[in-house]
Regions:
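Carbohydrate-active catalytic/glycan-binding domains of CAZyme proteins
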Residues: 1-211
Length: 211
């Protein structure tokens, strides 16, 4: 989705997607899902290369036609922090920030570049919906149920925030929209922030009375 001078445009895939890069049970399940959804034989679901990655394509002025063949913009050599889904790009000063949900599934990571379509360098994790990685915390010590996360960063006034969702009730399908204040240093580094209940408020709202 983009805001094109006041006009909101929403883009979505039509499929079927071929050559998806999966292994094992994921490949088996996805091949049958695409077969049923798009009425195609599961044999059309191949293994390489595929659209499961961070890709970019330049649009013509009609905002529909691709002017060039899509290309992969994010390296797969980020270890456990490789791209999974939820691509979002922002311009911060003279750098492009690519924010995404990593393959760990519970964290928003980011990479930066001088260009919007190439040469991105992995920088780190912005937030985890279980505080995994914050001050060295391991996943076994997570402070909340971990699972699917989406979001991005935005500047409001003079401050930057990360908007994301965390899980409630221990369910991956019960999601609470949240915001945390972040700081982007002169070297474009964002230190991972913890989960709080402050949201966009700058001060603590107080403590709950004892039961």
């Amino acid at each position: 989705m983009i805001n094109d001078e006041g006009r909101i445009r929403i883009y979505f895939g039509s499929g079927p997607f071929r050559n998806m890069r999966c292994e094992g049970w994921k490949k088996y399940i996805l091949s049958h899902v695409y077969s049923r959804v798009f009425n195609k034989p599961s044999s059309s679901f191949l293994t390489h290369p595929g659209p499961l990655g961070a890709n970019v394509g330049e649009l013509e002025d009609d905002m529909l036609t691709l002017s060039s063949k899509p290309k992969r913009i994010l390296s797969e050599n980020y270890g456990m922090h490789s791209f999974f889904e939820g691509a979002s790009i922002r311009k911060v000063r003279d750098k492009y920030f690519f924010v995404y949900s990593s393959s760990l599934n519970h964290e928003l990571c980011y990479a930066i570049s001088d260009y919007p379509d190439r040469d991105f360098k992995f920088m780190g994790t912005i937030i985890s919906n279980g505080d995994v990685g914050y001050e060295g915390r391991k996943e076994r010590d997570r402070v909340n149920a971990t699972g699917t996360i989406h979001g991005s960063i935005e500047k409001i006034g003079d401050d930057w925030y990360v908007f994301y969702h965390r899980l409630t009730g221990g369910s991956d399908y019960s999601r609470q929209v949240c915001a945390e204040r972040i700081e982007i240093n002169e070297d474009y580094h964002i230190t991972q922030v913890p989960l709080t209940s402050l949201g966009m408020d700058s001060k603590c709202l107080g403590e709950l009375p004892p039961p």
